[in-house]
A protein has these predicted regions:
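Conserved small/polar residues in nucleotide/adenosyl-binding loops
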Residues: 265-271
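Residues lining hydrophobic/aromatic ligand-binding pockets adjacent to catalytic sites
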Residues: 19
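Active-site pocket-lining/capping segments in soluble small-molecule metabolic enzymes
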Residues: 1-5, 9, 23-122, 129-154, ...
Length: 271
């Protein structure tokens, strides 16, 4: 991960040393991945899903400096998930108390076929400190998606012969995530950060239409149930939440009425 393998020359060098497969830097674009493939006769592995480090190729020294825990040795203290203030050169406050270094999670599920066509032969899913449910759901989703591609594209085949029967329908939105980004796959984009919170917002389940004395009128994309815990971003962009006491049609009665802004506030169900 931290070897910063982003040029054909470096991949050729590693292959010459005896490496049989090379993990490419996650910052590479699709065109750069394909260029490495065309120049090098070695299997390539790329990141497709999971948490992203704000440091280039995960080479971070801040955790060690501030907390005595080396991120480069697997003891990251999650410095980039903290709140920061941003001031200009004159000391004027631009942003206060925002998670300015917190990246969204990578999700290239919609780009698997493009990655295969670019020469990728192995997929890497980040899983540090993830639980069994996360691993099961995410790997099952990618396995299912790959199998769909292989059925249409006989020129591709599985590397193993094992078969798995799923008793559930995988859904990436139901596992922990900070919002999703494709990162730099098609070049630099401005939507890679999660400034409001480093926590998992969960799956979107509805939109607030009106707030009355003791209940909230919602337009739901998912059914609500008594006891649900719901989250939303308040007018200051801070993450808030409440517990549902009961549900009557499109009316939600919270156990304790929160201050919910009405202007198309999205409700999410945390994972």
């Amino acid at each position: 991960t931290q070897m910063d393998n982003r040029t054909p020359e470096k991949v050729k060098f590693l292959h010459g040393l005896g490496f049989s497969q090379v993990v490419l830097a996650r910052e590479l674009s699709l065109a750069e991945i394909q260029a490495v493939h065309e120049a090098c006769d070695v299997p390539l592995e790329v990141f497709v899903h999971g948490a992203l480090c704000v440091s280039y190729s995960g080479q971070c020294y801040v955790s060690q400096h501030c907390f005595g825990r080396s991120a480069n040795r697997g003891e990251c203290a999650q410095f980039c998930r903290l709140k920061f203030d941003m001031v200009d050169s004159d000391g004027r406050m631009i942003e206060q108390g925002r998670h300015l270094l917190s990246l969204k999670d990578m999700n290239r599920g919609a780009d698997l076929e493009r990655l295969l066509d670019a020469g990728v032969t192995s997929l890497k899913i980040e899983g540090r400190l993830k639980d069994v449910a996360y691993v099961k759901n995410v790997t099952a989703w990618y396995r299912s998606r790959l199998d769909e591609i292989f059925k249409r594209r006989p020129e591709y085949r599985r590397a193993s012969s094992g078969q798995v029967s799923l008793a559930f329908t995988p859904c990436l939105e139901k596992s922990f995530n900070r919002g999703f980004t494709r990162y730099f796959l098609d070049g630099r984009t401005p939507d890679i950060f999660s400034f409001h919170t480093p926590k998992s917002l969960g799956e979107e389940v509805g939109t607030v239409k009106d707030v009355r004395g003791k209940y909230i009128v919602v337009s739901g994309v998912k059914p609500f149930a008594n006891g649900d815990g719901l989250c939303f971003l308040d007018e200051q962009g801070n993450l808030q939440g409440f517990r549902v006491n009961r549900v009557e049609a499109n009316k939600i009665y919270p156990a304790e009425m929160p201050r919910v802004p009405v202007s198309y506030t999205h409700l999410t169900l945390p994972t």
